[in-house]
């Protein structure tokens, strides 16, 4: 949408301000919430975070995003951000410190590292990458300092941008206790804070839990919708699939998010 380059060259371009030109259009559509893919500084595609508290240079500055969020709120639209808490990019400050200081790094326990091994990047140590993607360095969410860092980042998002919700990237990879902790933390900041988790397959085990966020996305609906439309298959089959997914999560209210 913003036309930003794939690689982050560190040059600030105020592309996010283009959204101001679409405010009237969004309002005419009756949209009541905007969900943003990752907006924070990253190495490449947004899901490889460098800095959780700095808007990506390729789309603008924190001040730019504050302006966008205020304009959306003034028009009655809520703001939902993509929260990538399972992994970071290799450019993340703590991982860079490990690369430079190895065993002496104060951040070495922020990740799951074996200094007797090696990585595909020939770092001289092995670390766990998300699902074998070593450009995505898995965080050690069991470490209290990692938890505090991520929660403080969320606090900043709420305080600076007044966001209304978070979509949890790869929620199926996150420990349930972490999501429960995050939910409680966010609800203390904002009682009606919205949480949406990315789940593969059956999401009933998540959505029925009182401790977890009540809203979970499922790729089943997206995959089914795409294939029914692409193949011009009878629409009643698509409706039946959605009904089955809805029945598996009975008792959970649907969120009105456009």
Give each language-model segment a name.
Residues 34-36, 79-81, 166, 195-197, ...:
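Hydrophobic faces of well-ordered beta-strands that scaffold small-molecule active sites
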Residues 1-32, 39-155, 160, 182-188, ...:
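Substrate-binding/active-site clefts of carbohydrate-active enzymes
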Residues 69, 75, 99, 153-155, ...:
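Active-site-proximal helices and loops of the catalytic beta/alpha 8
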Residues 142, 165-166:
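Rossmann-like NAD(P)-binding element
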